[in-house]
């Protein structure tokens, strides 16, 4: 199993394009990134962006449009239209690409120096836990994207029905930031396994119907309950906040206990309302001990695995 990072200007361009078109109003939309990416846009470009936005929003599966754009599979008229009308904007994007290209090259080389040999057995156990064959753990490609200079950390996206991950690393490169980038890559790789799991879908749906619907709990702001269940499990596997099941291999440290992180979370509660991301990480941490037992004992995912996290949501969101 190998994870290979690469630079592809066309992939990065279409990611930039969909961001500046502002088609997405979900939790995935990042306003600071939008602002940075958009600073090169001129008034004359707005009709193009409006048309791109309309095409993506009108599709029954907008994320499939994005997957095909990133894969450069222009196999219908809307995809070909987006590629055609957006071509003049490549010059706008070029200044952003050139500004970070040198650092992206360093990140590509660093990521490709990572070894995943020590993670392969653990990832195979995770596949079994999800009801997948061990051979579901396969090679993946990481396409690097321009980050914004002020970004506090790396961010990634696992593209459904593909073998690739989109990654915005830190804007600057140094050895201390490698660990965070590696964790994000494995978090997104975990999403790829979760996306394949019918058992996860069944367990999540059953948990939602049993615990969420009867109490009419409202999901954390910016998230649907479907995305919450996905993130709960992915954070349990790899997280910059709670470490996750893979923490010993990724950081050389065990993941923290609930009691160890409780003072920090309670300070957040006392000072201000925690972010949705912080709430989901905190809930994931409560799942982690039992999830670890399931994986090590080769038990498959079921509804019960989510119950510790649901109790946290019940306390915080009711």
What are these model-derived regions, one by one?
Residues 179-199:
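Active-site recognition of the HExxH zinc-binding catalytic motif
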Residues 238-240, 246-318:
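Pan-zinc metallopeptidase signature
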Residues 196-226:
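Post-HEXXH active-site segment of zinc metalloproteases
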Residues 8, 113-120, 176, 180, ...:
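Soluble non-cytosolic domains of exported or imported proteins
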